[in-house]
Amino acid sequence: MHFFDRLADRIATADSVVSVGLDPDPARLPDSVLDADLPRWQFNRRIIDATHEHAACYKPNAAFYEDPDGWRALEETIAYAHGKNVPVLLDAKRGDIGNTARQYAQILDEDEGPAADAITVNPFLGRDSLEPFLQRADRGVFVLGRTSNPGGEDLQDLELASGEKLYERVVHLADLWNGNGNVGLVVGATNPDELEEIRELVPDIPFLVPGVGAQGGDAEAAVEHGLADGVGLVNSSRGIIFAGEDAATRRDDSGDAFFKAAGQSAKQLKQRLNQFR
């Protein structure tokens, strides 16, 4: 089954388009997980326990796992999320060529261990850099299209000789690369007008829409324009997983209050987004 079919099933089951970003910043982990063998894995496990009823997907960011214990934590996290029947989108933003790209793409192969169901990629090096990902037809490939960070406009707004902006060209290319029906686009929620414009350019490609949580993006626009035939994801990372930091300032040796707050935050975002579905 293709990734977007699996995602559609999960969206229907959870009645949710919420992607929960699993970015376990070591400096912000609660005391209740610090004595564990793998603190990041212990943290993610408890976040998943608290949020899985409201999650359409989990999105671990590879930068928080790129050390030996981190990769172990990531493998455990992927396996545990799958045990809850929630797909995993690895936010790695890979972009390289040849053997390096093929090596990066192995994170999508189940014979290499717990495999991510989808991945984010950087299209700057062109199609051949993405081909090892695209050819895995059952895995999702989310191409960076229009990002929500302020500096994104430095390159993405550049006007080409054709008259289109660079990000618009990337969007068109992503559509061309979608021969296996496994391509999505990363499109930030901080500019609703651009989100609408990009949806008009590619009516059938699901979006991963970051920026609705801590970055203050537009939830209504994220849902209205981010979904293709009801399929798409709206991500919140820090706004969910660290929602309990205030609760943790009180005596909470077990961490129960911290993780309960994460669950409540995921539920609230689901309800907020569902108003516009």
From Swiss-Prot:
GO biological processes: 'de novo' pyrimidine nucleobase biosynthetic process; 'de novo' UMP biosynthetic process
Reaction(s) catalysed by this chain's protein: orotidine 5'-phosphate + H(+) = UMP + CO2
EC number: 4.1.1.23
Gene3D superfamilies tied to this protein: Aldolase class I
Biochemical pathway: Pyrimidine metabolism; UMP biosynthesis via de novo pathway; UMP from orotate: step 2/2
InterPro entries (alphabetical): Aldolase_TIM, OMPdecase_AS, OMPdecase_type-2, OMPdeCOase_dom, RibuloseP-bd_barrel
Protein name from the UniProt record: Orotidine 5'-phosphate decarboxylase
Organism (species): Haloarcula marismortui (strain ATCC 43049 / DSM 3752 / JCM 8966 / VKM B-1809) (Halobacterium marismortui)
The organism's taxonomic lineage, starting at the top: Archaea, Methanobacteriati, Methanobacteriota, Stenosarchaea group, Halobacteria
